[in-house]
């Protein structure tokens, strides 16, 4: 479909829980994975774990994009050295008029952070904080207004789509 710019997959941790079933803008203050930690066979809120759907973003750990779309939005922003480069990329693709689609029928095991490591040193924490600031500068209006694919009556404190308290 020419209106689809990016397609992302369902990613599973080694323990058969969900690592990624889409990204919600605002989780953790910036962006986070929907349904993280839930059993891989759960259906989730309104069956969202098992439904093909449009989202604001998906993780670049496993996504597909046409070269023409990648070039049109000038690829990944190198200012985001590690964190949020994929979210920024997806948002640029959406801004260009394309859809970002989560496809739960494409499923893979993902050993998160095996290649990059954890944010466990002062330098890494400083870089991460800088990237949070940069994301806020670029996408502050979206952070303020909320993810258009997420109900504002639901909490951003948990990845299970539960009601705000």
Annotate each language-model stretch with its function.
Residues 1, 76-77, 151-152:
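Acidic/polar residues at beta-strand termini and the immediately following turn/coil
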Residues 1-30, 99, 105:
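Conserved donor NDP-sugar-binding/catalytic core segment of glycosyltransferases
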Residues 2, 84, 88, 123-130:
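A general alpha-helical scaffold signature found inside nucleotide-binding enzyme cores
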Residues 15-16, 27-55, 100, 117-165:
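C-terminal, non-catalytic tails of nucleotide-sugar-dependent glycosyltransferases
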Residues 47-74, 78-109:
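A short, conserved alpha-helix in the catalytic core of glycosyltransferases
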Residues 111-114:
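Conserved active-site-proximal loop/helix segments of enzymes involved in bacterial cell-wall
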């Amino acid at each position: 479909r020419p209106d689809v710019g990016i397609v992302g997959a369902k990613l599973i941790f080694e323990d058969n829980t969900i690592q990624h079933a889409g990204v919600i803008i605002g989780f953790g203050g910036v962006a986070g994975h929907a349904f993280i930690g839930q059993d891989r066979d759960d259906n989730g809120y309104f069956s969202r774990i098992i439904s093909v759907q449009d989202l604001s973003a998906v993780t670049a750990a496993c996504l597909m994009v046409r070269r023409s779309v990648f070039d049109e939005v000038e690829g990944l922003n190198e200012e985001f050295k590690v964190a949020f480069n994929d979210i920024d990329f997806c948002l640029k693709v959406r801004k260009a008029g394309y859809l970002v689609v989560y496809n739960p029928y494409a499923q893979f095991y993902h050993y998160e952070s095996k290649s990059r490591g954890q944010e466990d040193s002062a330098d890494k924490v400083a870089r991460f904080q800088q990237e949070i600031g940069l994301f806020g500068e670029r996408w502050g209006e979206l952070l303020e207004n909320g993810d258009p694919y997420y109900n504002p009556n639901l909490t951003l404190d948990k990845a299970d789509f539960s009601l705000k308290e």
